[in-house]
Every structure is written in structure tokens, then in C-alpha cells.
Amino acid sequence: MYNLIKDVKKLNPLVIHYTNNVTINDCANVTLAVGASPLMSFSYEEVEEMVSVANSVVINIGTMNSNMLDLFLLAGKAANKYNKPVVLDPVGVFASKARAELTSRLLNEVKFSVVKGNVSEIKFIGGFNVRGKGVDSFDEEEDSTEIIRKIAEKLECVVVATGKIDIITNGKGTYKINNGTDKLKGITGTGCMTASLIASFMAVTENILEAATMGVLTMSLSGELANLNNPPIGTFKENLMNAIYQMDIDALSKNSNIEFLN
């Protein structure tokens, strides 16, 4: 699985993003840092053409509005048409009725390879009661592994639930990642950037579970390494991007705290 970090850098896959305008710059930069090539678009007119040549697709509802629904649906359906792996990041799905309805329609009409969110977002999608505010989760203290696994079975895709312990599962096999730092919460967009990393790895392998795990692990481990010596938040963000850029098989092998459950 760790070899995927080399494959991304070697193949430089094209990852098209239909994402939010708060974190779009960071998502583009993190895609470059890991070795892929980002394309950011809000254009209806080019969806078919762009998705057909991309290697993977990101759909992120973070700054959704009434005009975005059709764009997201168009992009998702194009990804399915051209057999491109696509990740959904349902940012703040529990925060409003409009977000919940948008996400429900996307899940009903598009076959996603990965659905990625924090624990509260994923549990909400699965029909469970959640504790959260805005786009932030308060559900991280309890072990939600079995709940997330059942949601993955229901959605018939890989599900990523980030938190104190990150959970990645397709309903059959499950990875749990114990790397990371609370300081990742102090930067807007680390979740969005994680979706970009997942898409970068999905673009170079058919093993979606491993690709999603590598995306989450790269962010969590890079955050841990970036926080050595407890730098202030601005320095931490710079360190984070540098750590992602420098991530390699050796660093993954030496520092990953990961377990696999059947």
C-alpha cells in the first residue's frame, strides 16, 4: 500500500475538483504536494470534457448554493459514465436541511467510490443522531467503528470517518489510523485537503480501500510530523504542506500507527 506514494509522484494523475471556495487553494496545493495535478472548476460547460480526461474526481459541498446542485450531479454522473473514481465530501451535512437534501440526492443519483467526512457527518448520513456544530464534530470520543462499517455496507462504497482515530472501511475490511494531532483542527480545510489526497491515490490504483487509507494516513501522519516541537499554528500549516511534499515509503514505514480489522 505504501508504494502508492511513489506511484502518484511517478504518474502525476489529473484530479478534477468541484469544491468549495474557502479551501480551494489549499486543495490545489496539497494535490501538487503529493505529486498529482489539480484542476479546479465551477463550469457547467466543460464538465463532460474535463471529467472524461481526468483520473479522479472530488465533489465537496462546503460552500454549496442553489446553483451548485446541478453541477455536482452533472460531475458525479459524468464520473460514473467514464468510470472515474469519485469522492464525496459532504461538509457540514448535518448543519442545515439544504445540505442534508443535497447530499441525499447526490448519494441516490451518483455511485461514489468514497464518502469522506468527520464522524458526525458520516453518522448523520447513516441516520444516526450526532453531536456537532456547523462543520465541526463532537462525536470523536466514542468508538464508532462498527457503526461506520454498517454505513459503508449500506452505501456500498468505501467510507472514511476522520477523528481522534480515523476509520476507513468498505464494510468488509477496516483500517484504523492512530496518527495525527489535535492541531489539525486549528486549520480550515484539512478535511477538504484529505479528500484531495484520497482522490490523488484513487487515480493510480483500483484498490479504493487502500487509496482512501493512504489519503487519510498521509494527512494524519504529516500533521503529527508537522507538530514536532509544537510550533505556532502558522508555522504548523507550513510544516504540514512540507511534510506531505516530503512523505515517502520510509517515513510511512517508520511512523505509521495503523491496524487492519477483518
UniProtKB/Swiss-Prot annotation:
Pathway note: Cofactor biosynthesis; thiamine diphosphate biosynthesis; 4-methyl-5-(2-phosphoethyl)-thiazole from 5-(2-hydroxyethyl)-4-methylthiazole: step 1/1
CDD domains: THZ_kinase
Short name of one Pfam family: HK
Required cofactor names: Mg(2+)
Membrane spanning stretches: none
UniProt-annotated binding residues for ATP: K116, T162
BP term (GO), one: thiamine biosynthetic process
Enzyme Commission number: 2.7.1.50
Family: Belongs to the Thz kinase family.
Function: Catalyzes the phosphorylation of the hydroxyl group of 4-methyl-5-beta-hydroxyethylthiazole (THZ).
Protein name, entry field: Hydroxyethylthiazole kinase
Species assigned in the record: Clostridioides difficile (strain 630) (Peptoclostridium difficile)
